[in-house]
From Swiss-Prot:
Cellular component terms (Gene Ontology): cytosol
Domain of life: Bacteria
Function description: Phosphorylation of dTMP to form dTDP in both de novo and salvage pathways of dTTP synthesis.
Residues the record lists as binding ATP: G10, G11, E12, G13, A14, G15, K16, T17
Gene: tmk
GO molecular function: ATP binding; dTMP kinase activity
Catalytic activity: dTMP + ATP = dTDP + ADP
Record's protein name: Thymidylate kinase
NCBIfam families (UniProt xref): DTMP_kinase (TIGR00041)
Keyword check for Cytoplasm: no
Biological processes per GO annotation: dTDP biosynthetic process; dTTP biosynthetic process; dUDP biosynthetic process
EC numbers, comma separated: 2.7.4.9
């Protein structure tokens, strides 16, 4: 099976990061050659850029600067980690990708979805995800989850007002409308177990479609159904 690029998207507090970790372990247990990574970050240079973007002291960061920093982190991450993994036939699970930039900077920051996509088109060299899962949660509930999680370190985006987070959600809806075949929606307000099951079922179905011959079916339950 050729390498496959699967991305996970959602607003703050959607719970996708936790789900990715669990899905990653399940795929490993089923013998899938898979890696887990994130944006911005995943490698040394991009993690340093992440710390600059997320630093709560950098409230003066201008919108275009923010968009370009994300794009720079994305490029280095692709070159060092994602491209090599895909070339080796691995499944890549990535926490956020270009859709985040379109929703956050393109729509919520008001830079324009098309304009931000143009920046990223130069960066990604047509490397769009094969499958994207959007974790759907109302912005208010997502922020309530963050507030209740005492172990989560607050970043600069967490400090934005509710209007911004609602705009991010609206931005995602516009991105989903542009890429309806690629982006699948997960109801993230369910219990974690239900969210994981829905996520794994979509990924399993997708991987089975791509698996040549179809002799080694992947399923959430570990049985033959």
């Amino acid at each position: 099976m050729a390498g496959l690029f699967i991305t996970f998207e959602g607003g703050e507090g959607a719970g996708k990061t936790t789900v990715i970790q669990h899905i990653f372990q399940k795929l490993i247990a089923q013998g899938i050659d898979v890696i887990q990574t994130r944006e911005p970050g995943g490698i040394k240079i991009s993690e340093k850029i992440r710390s600059i973007i997320h630093d709560p002291e950098h409230l003066e960061m201008e919108e275009r600067t923010e968009a370009l920093l994300y794009a720079a982190a994305r490029r280095q991450h692709l070159v060092e980690k994602v491209f090599p993994a895909l070339e080796q036939g691995k499944v890549v699970l990535c926490d956020r990708f270009v859709d985040s930039s379109l929703a956050y900077q393109g729509y919520a920051r008001g830079l324009g979805i098309d304009e931000v996509y143009a920046i990223n088109h130069f960066v990604i060299q047509d490397c769009m995800p094969d499958l994207t899962l959007f974790f759907d949660i109302e912005p208010k509930k997502g922020l309530e989850r963050i507030a209740a999680n005492k172990n989560r370190e607050r970043n600069r985006l967490d400090l934005e007002n509710m209007q911004f987070h609602e705009a991010v959600y609206e931005g995602y809806q516009k991105v989903i409308a542009r890429f309806p075949e690629r982006i699948k929606t997960i109801q993230a307000e369910q219990a974690l177990e239900a969210v994981e099951q829905d996520t794994m079922e979509i990924i399993s179905s997708f991987l089975n479609e791509k698996e040549k011959g179809g002799n080694n079916e992947i399923n959430y339950y570990g049985d033959s159904r």
